[in-house]
């Protein structure tokens, strides 16, 4: 006789084990019709799963924008599998999980799927969903599940059972009419909930993400509760495609990638200009917040990486080389090198906090399938910093780091920032006392600045709690960039100590701090955020001067030289082309200011100024324009509207 407690505190008693759907039906037919699944004592369950003991229950409906939508998307992945097996009976099904904003299914199929094939598959999915057939869940023994998929010729499902499912477990088999899939669930009770979806694209993916395994075909899709939300998402995807940093990078001559150096960036002059301006900006912040800038070696002996613990955890992601019977690893991160710098010379508590920053050139052997333009690379520059401090200094230093993060992001126009605090995991180093003190210090730092945050219980690293900063761009995409991570482990492993007030040797706390993360990735984010319309201070070309006839050529060149001497990235366009043609061309290149000179301007010692978005700013004396643009550059104004 389970007693079910609902979110409003009311209780309902049942004579027999009861399902979420039956509870919903007891409340009303409208709720039952909208019910997708349940959350029993905080755990998601299928609407048909029986509740045998007293429990709290939340009914998940179509209006649930988090769990409800994820369940719909997961069920759409099964629907995709259903359609695929009808159209391609020879296909071998691998996995079909949800991802941010959608789902995918990995399949083993000899023929390569095209966009036309995706349209055919989507059409079949819609035909199936239109029937609103019921999804039937059956819990079976491990052996029965294995026999089921072996008889159906599904080797990937069999492998999952053999390697990932306990023999004592009872896997859930979901019957979609003649199609059967295996999943933890939950899933929708019927396909009437899966009406608003589309397939997006197909790509290659190694089975289990291992390049030693077979390359499968991964079909991506997305789904929403209603047609309006789906349409809005597809519009965002279209806008994202227009803003693709790879496309704009080529258009603006910023960088390129090539097969001979996978995951390594070839920076062109225009792109390197942006990179250097970012470095200058970060250096200004480092000076403002009292950091020392250092530079560590690109590679170090394997012995050091073994002592730091990185060899055990990151060896597969590290590039190595050897010389004179010694093995070296190219650094994937800067922290062990910074500890070596700290260790040079005796340190006192009076020397702390010591803030050490580096534009570290790091390399990680990312899988080739994961590489993506300059967003996911193998060679990158990290705006890394490490703060060595005492336990009593943690809160003050963390607060300073948080201020620096917000100062930086606001300069680029990122105001929507989600903050997450990850607390101690079960397996960890350090005393409970230091964890208590550190977690409280992180909380106090955030609360003192009135910053809302989410707590991720048990998600901290084994060596310390951390704060993560995720910024959202103009398309509402999340980018996790900033991190403030406490470390009670590495300094001790690498022998870092300082002399305390009582002349005892103590191990400092280390704070790992990144703001932009990888400069390459952050530039990619900026390209897509601004669609190539960089603020003037970042723009590779800040002004272009154009003559109307050859008569003004000399005057234009004089002005260009004057602008350049004033620190403005300016150039002349003296081509024998119509002025409208030249303006259009430089507009496409996103040059912030186009300066036009005709006879009238030359005689008056002026220039006609217009922005790349077509706004006419009128005529300026040359010195007045220099003062105008210098103010915009030095103050790092966004000026995105112009």
UniProtKB/Swiss-Prot annotation:
Cofactor: Zn(2+)
GO annotations of cellular component type: cytosol
Biological-process GO terms, alphabetical: threonyl-tRNA aminoacylation
Assigned EC number: 6.1.1.3
Residues binding Zn(2+), per UniProt: 335, 386, 512
Pfam families xref list: HGTP_anticodon (PF03129), TGS (PF02824), tRNA-synt_2b (PF00587), tRNA_SAD (PF07973)
Cofactor note text: Binds 1 zinc ion per subunit.
Catalytic EC class: ligase
UniProt GO molecular function: ATP binding; metal ion binding; threonine-tRNA ligase activity; tRNA binding
Segments forming domain TGS: 1-61
UniProt-listed SUPFAM superfamilies: Class II aaRS ABD-related, Class II aaRS and biotin synthetases, TGS-like, ThrRS/AlaRS common domain
Keywords: Aminoacyl-tRNA synthetase, ATP-binding, Cytoplasm, Ligase, Metal-binding, Nucleotide-binding, Protein biosynthesis, RNA-binding, tRNA-binding, Zinc
Superkingdom of source: Bacteria
Localisation: Cytoplasm
Catalytic activity: tRNA(Thr) + L-threonine + ATP = L-threonyl-tRNA(Thr) + AMP + diphosphate + H(+)
Keyword Transmembrane: no
Family the UniProt entry places it in: Belongs to the class-II aminoacyl-tRNA synthetase family.
Subunit details: Homodimer.
Role this protein plays: Catalyzes the attachment of threonine to tRNA(Thr) in a two-step reaction: L-threonine is first activated by ATP to form Thr-AMP and then transferred to the acceptor end of tRNA(Thr). Also edits incorrectly charged L-seryl-tRNA(Thr).
Name of the protein: Threonine--tRNA ligase
Organism this protein belongs to: Vibrio parahaemolyticus serotype O3:K6 (strain RIMD 2210633)
Record gene name: thrS
């Amino acid at each position: 006789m389970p007693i079910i407690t609902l979110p409003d505190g009311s209780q309902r008693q049942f004579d027999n084990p009861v399902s979420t759907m039956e509870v919903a039906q007891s409340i009303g037919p409208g709720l039952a019709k909208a019910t997708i699944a349940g959350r029993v004592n905080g755990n998601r369950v299928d609407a048909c799963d029986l509740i045998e003991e007293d429990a709290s229950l939340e009914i998940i409906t179509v209006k649930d924008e988090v769990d409800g939508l994820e369940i719909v998307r997961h069920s759409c992945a099964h629907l995709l599998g259903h359609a695929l097996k009808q159209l391609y009976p020879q296909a071998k099904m691998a996995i079909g999980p949800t991802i941010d904003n959608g789902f995918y299914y990995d399949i083993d199929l000899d023929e390569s799927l095209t966009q036309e094939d995706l349209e055919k598959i989507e059409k079949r999915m819609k035909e199936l969903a239109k029937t609103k057939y019921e999804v039937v869940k059956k819990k079976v023994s491990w052996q029965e599940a294995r026999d089921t998929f072996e008889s159906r010729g599904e080797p990937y499902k069999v492998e999952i059972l053999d390697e990932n499912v306990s023999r004592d477990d009872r896997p859930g088999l979901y019957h979609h009419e003649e199609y059967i899939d295996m999943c933890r669930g939950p899933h929708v009770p019927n396909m009437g909930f899966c009406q608003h979806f589309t397939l997006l694209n197909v790509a290659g993916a190694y089975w289990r993400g291992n390049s030693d395994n077979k390359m499968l075909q991964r079909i991506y899709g997305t789904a929403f509760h209603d047609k309006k939300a789906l349409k809005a998402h597809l519009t965002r995807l279209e806008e994202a495609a227009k803003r693709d940093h790879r496309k704009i990078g080529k258009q603006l001559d910023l960088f390129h990638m090539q097969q001979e150096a996978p995951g390594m960036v070839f920076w062109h002059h225009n792109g390197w200009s942006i990179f250097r301006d970012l470095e200058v900006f970060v250096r200004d912040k480092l000076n403002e917040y009292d950091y020392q800038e250092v530079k560590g070696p690109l590679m170090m002996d394997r012995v050091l990486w073994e002592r730091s613990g990185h060899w055990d955890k990151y060896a597969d992601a590290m590039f190595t080389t050897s010389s004179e019977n010694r093995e070296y690893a190219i650094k994937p991160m800067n922290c062990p090198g910074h500890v070596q710098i700290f260790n040079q010379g005796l340190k006192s508590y009076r020397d702390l906090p010591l803030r050490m920053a580096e534009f570290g050139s790091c390399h990680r052997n990312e899988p080739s399938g994961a590489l993506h333009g300059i967003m996911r690379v193998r060679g990158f520059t990290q705006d890394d910093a490490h703060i060595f401090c005492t336990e009593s200094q943690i809160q003050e230093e963390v607060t300073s780091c948080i201020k620096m993060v917000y100062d930086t992001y606001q300069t680029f126009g990122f105001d929507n920032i989600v903050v997450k605090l990850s607390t101690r995991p079960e397996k960890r180093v350090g005393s409970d006392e230091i964890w208590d003190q550190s977690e409280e210090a992180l909380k106090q730092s955030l609360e003192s600045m009135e910053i809302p945050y989410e707590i991720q219980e048990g998600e901290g690293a084994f060596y310390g709690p951390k704060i993560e900063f995720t910024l959202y761009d103009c398309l509402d995409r999340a980018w996790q960039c900033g991190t403030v991570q406490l470390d009670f482990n590495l300094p001790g492993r690498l022998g870092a100590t300082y002399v305390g007030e009582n002349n005892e040797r103590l191990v400092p706390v280390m704070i790992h701090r990144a703001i932009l993360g990888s400069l390459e990735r952050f530039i990619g984010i900026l390209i897509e955020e601004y669609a190539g319309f960089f603020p003037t201070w970042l723009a590779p070309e800040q002004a272009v001067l154009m003559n109307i006839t050859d008569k003004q050529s000399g005057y234009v060149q004089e002005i260009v030289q004057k602008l350049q001497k004033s620190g403005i990235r300016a150039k002349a366009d003296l081509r024998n082309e119509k002025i409208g043609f030249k303006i259009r061309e430089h507009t496409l290149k996103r040059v912030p200011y186009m300066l036009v000179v005709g006879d009238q301007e030359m005689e008056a010692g002026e220039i006609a100024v217009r922005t790349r978005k077509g706004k006419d700013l009128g005529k300026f004396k040359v010195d007045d324009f220099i003062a105008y643009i210098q103010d915009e550059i030095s103050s790092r104004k966004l000026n995105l509207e112009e």
